[in-house]
Amino acid sequence: MGASKYMQELWRKKQSDVMRFLLRVRCWQYRQLSALHRAPRPTRPDKARRLGYKAKQGYVIYRVRVRRGGRKRPVPKGATYGKPVHHGVNQLKFARSLQSIAEERAGRHCGGLRVLNSYWVGEDSTYKFFEVILIDTFHKAIRRNPDMQWITKAVHKHREMRGLTSAGKKSRGLGKGHKFHLTIGGSRRAAWRRRNTLQLHRYR
């Protein structure tokens, strides 16, 4: 078993004594740092490489701390101004995952970089920690690499804001297989519109 496969198997057993100790120590370490900071190298090199990371110039890793829990509706003094059915303020759940929020915060902070992907590195009772892979699209090592030239195009600016990363697509219900039948046609709205539109063709 190679080193990468060995690490992968270690991370699969997060309840083992070794991983429980490591994750506890790392969570303590991450809590002492700022909510968003650059990591010198990926904590999970095997996972980062599976998501597209390479240990070469132009690739950057940022670690993000996101507070766990639901999302309170941002209204002054709970005044929602509407029907009682929409008066909810506290028990609301955000439509997107905490991972996609972490990607968005990293993308906002590093406006000149492109978000490629992200992965989980730890959590405690209050926070979740993610590492985000960002790419410097103006670096020659990226622009000259045929495998990564796609992300240098302008259409991929701030893809994390538009739900185009893996974590963003998950909350949009996009994917392959029987689990994702609600979004056949591109989105939930497109699928709903097609199923709820009566088409009376001229020749039928």
Swiss-Prot record:
PROSITE patterns in the record:
RIBOSOMAL_L15E (PS01194)
Q: Does the keyword Cell membrane apply?
A: no
Keywords, A to Z, come to: Cytoplasm, Ribonucleoprotein, Ribosomal protein
Cellular compartment(s) = Cytoplasm
Q: What GO terms are given for molecular function?
A: RNA binding; structural constituent of ribosome
SMART domains xref list: Ribosomal_L15e
Signal peptide region: none
- The primary location reported for this protein is cytoplasm
**Which InterPro entries does UniProt cross-reference here?**
Rbsml_eL15_core_dom_sf, Ribosomal_eL15, Ribosomal_eL15_CS, Ribosomal_uL23/eL15/eS24_sf
One Gene Ontology term, aspect cellular component: cytosolic large ribosomal subunit
One GO term (biological process): cytoplasmic translation
**Pfam families named among the record's database cross-references:** Ribosomal_L15e
Q: Which domain of life is it from?
A: Eukaryota
Q: What does this protein do?
A: Component of the large ribosomal subunit. The ribosome is a large ribonucleoprotein complex responsible for the synthesis of proteins in the cell.
Family assignment from sequence similarity? Belongs to the eukaryotic ribosomal protein eL15 family.
This protein's assembly is summarised as: Component of the large ribosomal subunit.
Q: What is this protein called?
A: Large ribosomal subunit protein eL15
Origin organism is: Silurus meridionalis (Southern catfish)
- Give the gene symbol: rpl15
